[in-house]
Amino acid sequence: HKSSRGLGDVYKRQVFIYTCIYTPLKPITPLSVFVGAIPGAIPFMLGWVAATNSFGIEPGTLFMIQFFWQFPHFWALGWMLDDDYKKAGFNMLPTGKKDKKTATQIILYIIWMIIISIFPYSGLTGALSLSIYGAIIVLILGILMLMFAVNLYNRMNTESARRLFLFTIFYLTSIQLVYIFDKFI
């Protein structure tokens, strides 16, 4: 099948980027997270393509949600485990700079993620759509995540980073469920 071959090709590229580019960059630059966000966002997209046998704005939107989600997720983790990453020889953001600049970057990526996450309500994302109820739930979840990030910005401590990190996991799981079950409301 042509679509299976295409999915396999994308998967091979994902594995290549992760193993041959992202992993070697980890001890070199904290910017490796940007490269790693690409293969990290591909599975979300591939799930759509595998289920529908089509590629378009829908999987692209899912890719972008997952792409932007990874930054607050991994930067909160990096904030919590900075010493461990240093011991392992990895340069992860915040790279010892648990400062307002890092917290501001987290906030900005969350804002972009919120915008992209509610975009399916616009009707411009093809079969990936949200009802007003689904959009409100996704928006509330995004605002809650933003509040955790603002708390990190204000307190600048590991506990705030931990709470943000845990909420990022809850957020991603929740919005995926909203996208699925919103169709039945």
At which residue positions do the language-model features occur?
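Small-residue-rich segments of transmembrane alpha-helices in multi-pass membrane proteins
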Residues: 34-49, 100, 165-177
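Hydrophobic alpha-helical transmembrane segments in multi-pass integral membrane proteins
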Residues: 45-54, 113-120, 171-185
